[in-house]
């Protein structure tokens, strides 16, 4: 067996749309201290497992029912397709494994297989273009913790957030360009939200985020861990590549929880505002998601469209994520080849 391999890690999905399966998934997901990080224990566990998850599970199960396919979860299906296509592109000398941060296949079980297969060098590619403690960071921490437990000798290299990588932007443009070419009035870039507090928590200097005027547009080393600055950078790069007019596109944030301020403006509010302002034809793009999932297929394509149309909009199009399209497979393959070449030196 080859001694070098690739590990793709995505978010995950419930095993089914049943309330017990969804509850089990949410218990693991929302129980992650990097997703919901307060209050202090034991109160956080009580809040998550006795209040939030029981209340959310039935509604979340219904939402999953709206997007579930005969083959199961769209995110899992697409992630497997990415794994298979990347493996076919790289060839048998570089196996590609797939794990989910929450649910199955778990990071622990997949790393067990990697160790059993005799892999000594591993390239970890979190399926997140941007840094956030609740997405990219939790994947990396979990993989390194599990690797240290199962295989201390395993050498793990991690692909850093690629939010402004020219090849990533080109892949986004290749998939989005046919939609940009269609008649439309406005493009809304909708990114997954995070608590504002998480931005400040990620600022190791404690002197920039929410302190410096226009902090996300003021160059700083702390942008290496600033989710908001990174999504702005993605938006600027893709808008420039596509030639989008500055007054015909903007950024919003979706998927917020209640209880504290999250990044704004909120996507549902923006869809309503834009429709009431006379925007009739809107394109919605979700670059933080590499694979279409609950947040794009239900929250945007179903609920978002309903919000926009009810407020007076007429044409609503959610531009698909990169999914398993050739430009994204090529992007991943190039990242792997760069690593393979570097590890030969």
UniProtKB/Swiss-Prot annotation:
Organism superkingdom: Bacteria
CDD domains according to UniProt: Ferrochelatase_C, Ferrochelatase_N
Main location: cytoplasm
Positions contributing to Fe cation binding: 192, 295
Coiled coil: none
EC number(s) from the headed UniProt entry: 4.98.1.1
GO cellular component: cytoplasm
Pathway in which the depicted protein is active: Porphyrin-containing compound metabolism; protoheme biosynthesis; protoheme from protoporphyrin-IX: step 1/1
Family named by the database record: Belongs to the ferrochelatase family.
Protein name: Ferrochelatase
High-level lineage: Bacteria, Pseudomonadati, Verrucomicrobiota, Opitutia, Opitutales
């Amino acid at each position: 067996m080859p001694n070098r391999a690739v590990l793709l890690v995505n978010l995950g999905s419930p095993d089914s749309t049943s309330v017990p399966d969804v509850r089990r998934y949410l218990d693991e997901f929302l129980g992650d201290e990097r997703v919901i990080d307060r209050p202090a224990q034991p109160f956080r566990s009580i809040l998550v497992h006795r209040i939030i998850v029981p209340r959310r599970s039935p509604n979340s199960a219904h939402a999953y029912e709206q997007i579930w396919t005969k083959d199961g979860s769209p995110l899992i299906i697409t992630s497997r397709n990415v794994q298979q296509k990347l493996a076919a592109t790289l060839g048998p000398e570089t196996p590609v494994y797939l794990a989910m941060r929450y649910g199955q296949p778990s990071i622990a079980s997949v790393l067990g297989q990697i160790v059993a297969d005799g892999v000594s060098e591993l390239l970890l590619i979190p399926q997140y273009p941007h840094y956030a403690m609740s997405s990219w960071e939790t994947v990396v921490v979990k993989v390194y913790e599990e690797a240290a437990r199962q295989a201390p000798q395993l050498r793990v290299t991690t692909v850093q957030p690629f939010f402004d990588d020219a090849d990533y932007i080109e892949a986004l443009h290749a998939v989005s360009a046919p939609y940009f070419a269609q008649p439309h009035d406005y493009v809304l870039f909708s990114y997954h939200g995070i608590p504002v507090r998480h931005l400040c928590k990620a600022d190791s200097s404690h002197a920039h985020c929410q302190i410096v005027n226009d902090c996300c547009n003021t160059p700083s080393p702390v942008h290496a861990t600033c989710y908001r600055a990174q999504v702005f950078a993605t938006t600027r790069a893709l808008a420039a590549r596509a030639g989008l007019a500055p007054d015909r596109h903007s950024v919003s944030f979706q998927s917020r929880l209640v209880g504290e301020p999250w990044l704004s403006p909120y996507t549902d509010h923006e869809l309503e505002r834009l429709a009431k302002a006379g925007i009739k034809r809107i394109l919605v793009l979700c670059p933080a998601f590499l694979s279409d999932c609950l947040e794009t297929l239900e929250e945007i394509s179903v609920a978002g469209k309903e919000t926009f149309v009810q407020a007076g909009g007429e044409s609503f199009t959610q531009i698909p994520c990169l999914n398993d399209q050739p430009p994204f497979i090529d992007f991943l393959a190039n990242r792997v080849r760069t690593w393979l070449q570097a590890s030969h030196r």
